[in-house]
Amino acid sequence: MMLLRPLFTLVFAGVLAMIDTSASTAAAPNGILPVSADGKPLNTDFETGDLRDWTATGDIAKGQPTKGPINQKRKFGAGRVANHVGDFWFGGYEKFEDVPTGTLTSAPFKVTQPWAAFLIGGGSHAGTRVELVAKDGGKVLFSARGQNNETMLPVVVDLQPHQDKEIFIRIVDDVTGGWGHVNFDDFKFYKEKPAFAAVATSAAAPGQKPNPLPQDDVKFAGLSPEEAVKAMTLPPGFKATLFAGEPDVKQPIAFCLDDRGRLWVVENYTYPQRQPEGKGTDRILVFEDTDGDGKFNQRTVFYEGLNLASAIEWGFGGVYVGAAPWLLHIPVKETAAGPQPAGEPVKLLEGFAWQDTHEMLNTFTWGPDGWLYGCHGVFTHSHVKVVGAPDTERQFINAGVWRYHPTKKRFEVFAEGTSNPWGIDFNQYGHCFIEACVIPHLFHMIQGGRYQRQGGQHYAPTIEEAKRIVPDYFTQDFAKPGKQPITPYIYDDLKTIADHRHFTGNQWNNQDRATSGVIGGGHAHAGLMCYLGGSWPAEYHGKLIMGNIHGQRLNVDVPERKGSGYVGKHAPDFLNFNDRWSQTLNQQLDPDGNVFVIDWYDKQQCHTGNAPAHDRSNGRIYKISYGDKKGTQVDLGKLDLGLLLAELPSTNAWRTRHAQRILQERVAGNVPGWDRPALRKHFPTGVFDYLTGTNAKGQRLDEDYKTVPAQLRVLWTLHATGLWTLEDALQLLRRPDHTTSEFTRAWTIQLLCEEINPGTAALAEFARLAKDDPSPVVRLYLASACQRLTVAERTPIVEALIAHAEDATDHNLPLMYWFATEPLVAASPLKGALLLGKAKIPLLREYITRRMTAK
């Protein structure tokens, strides 16, 4: 049986306009007060000046009703307008601010007219609401909330289904924090649907279009797994299948797919509080669909006893697991009973913190460069190092993207900033995107970039920069760390690429659900996937699909090229779950180019440290497919060298990424026959030569390798396997730019700097490209590369970059140039003066001067 939310009709006011702040009443049609059983009008407009006909619990009634307009001298009172009718109204904040709580319930009365209306303002919390309740049975017939504004707005209610029934009004205030109050006035009946005019809204500032009072219009909540699938809204041609649901899976916080397409799922039961050592209850399950019907038929409990596990990824003979303070690797062996641990978890990294248990290390994925990437939230402060390394190798992170190399055992902060990113992916050109919460939602993450932050200050993202700016950071007691390597010389940061938002309000989603629902659903996002599956319609190729928690849907953004980066355009939502409890946390491709989605599924939508507030009994995994083709069985781990290489130009990123990682594993493992000559022998005609210089024009390229993404995949594979030489890279860079892609040149620059010191020949090419290359993408990668070079090495490159006046209006380049330039100015005021003479970008001239005069 479906658990339906209370059904009601909520009609918005007609034309909305600005209100004269000197007025104390809203223009409204004449209404009729409800009457009691003895025929006397009830005090539902408070014009008796007291609370007769109302019954209170708690201290909600203290000091009520309020008389007259809002006191402009009270806290936050300046400019506030109540929009009340008559002299008296219920003003939940006016006497004692947000402290009082309780309920205020009217005497029951009969519905004598087909329509009713009232005014409501105050908070948008579920715990600050006005309800119309049936006297018999106590069923809530209607519920409305404010929109975090003191100005009350009219709500019109269709009561025709309840004619001649007895109902009562109940004002509920269970919240004591910000906007923890209700404003209410003037409940009356109407013979016809009333039309209101001259009503203010929270968005009706000068020059802005006013927003109507939103309705809480999510169709369902608390559905069973089977009902949840039926409730979804999908585009034509798509279908959703329940792959697994409770009791088979509960609290799925992270998942990955192995080389056989099996799902490895982390169930997190310890959140929101890390348990004492040895008391963790999180576990890893493995699901397999052997008949291709989109539903699991084999389930294995792989590992139990993890503590605050938050991320997982397959690779190098096991699974990488994030469980603060550790990055773990659990080796896997195959048995008749399913996959089992082949040994104890190996601790690879230490120092991940958990001050905020919903902002920890999360959403692992393999980058195109062969590193394991992850995200990290802003209100958790980690000091990370490789296990066994000295404290002088710790790197601080409290917002951003990090990466770990599986064979070189290195940890790096890739980019710094944003808020609580919980979703990361790469497009066909290897460009990194994340989603964020609270602040704008979409960012193109560039190596060495510093980004808008929800809170806190920018920090040094490398050990070298931390030693230069905050050398005593490394001398503290990291058992109780307090110091952060804050850098005061950033001056500004990179902003969102999105040209839109998915929520109303300033920063927090302070409006009701429907106001944000029209534009995307809300500020809380989790999970991001760049669709590169190859089996969905072409219109989805390259689009970014991200989960929206408050909006119970999957949003879609379209990254369109502009300058050195992208603009994120809004596209229609891909999927709406129509279920308030749905909270998807990530989505990933499968071997057929369809998509799996994990759903935490919980009535409690926002983070709270109160563990009992979370429902531990449920969780879902859905499969979203296009068409009716059955799932195929794969095992890429059994493919030989030639067949693995043949997967690289696939249009399905699941296949190309897994094939590349397997090749990386086997070369790293010194498997006989997996070397450069063997790779050269098995690559299709011309592509190996094309990327190593001997086929400069690509005349003999196999058809599959004529696309830039396919060429990049080969380039990344050669690098990840260690089979791409310095000479290969230099030959590629030395070609005329019209014979190579700007993306190939850009990636050659990044990969040459992976080992920090690319060599004098490469540095000379960098300086030449900085001066002459026509591509802003190449210049962007050079700016990133400079941050991995010494002051002396980067100087000629920076001098050439900052002379590009055409880059002054680019979204990324002026600030990326500054991040590369700042250490030069810090090293020598004379150098700063020389750079001023070369800089053709006004922002850089300003920042160079500012840094020269800083203490």
Map each language-model feature to its residues:
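N-terminal pre-domain segments of enzymes
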Residues: S24-I60, P65, Y190-T233
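Beta-propeller domains with acidic blade repeats across secreted/periplasmic ectodomains
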Residues: A205-A646, W654-R657, R661-Q664, G669
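Long, ordered, helix-rich scaffold segments
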Residues: I598, A611-G619, K623-K855
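Extracellular glycan-recognition surfaces and repeat-rich motifs
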Residues: D50-W89
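Extracellular carbohydrate recognition
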Residues: V175-K191, A197
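Short beta-strands within extracellular/lumenal beta-sheet-rich domains
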Residues: D87-Q113, A126-T128, M152-V155
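Extracellular carbohydrate recognition and processing domains
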Residues: V133-I167, V172-W179
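Extended extracellular/luminal ectodomain segments enriched in beta-structured repeat modules
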Residues: V99, F109-A117, D164-E166, E539
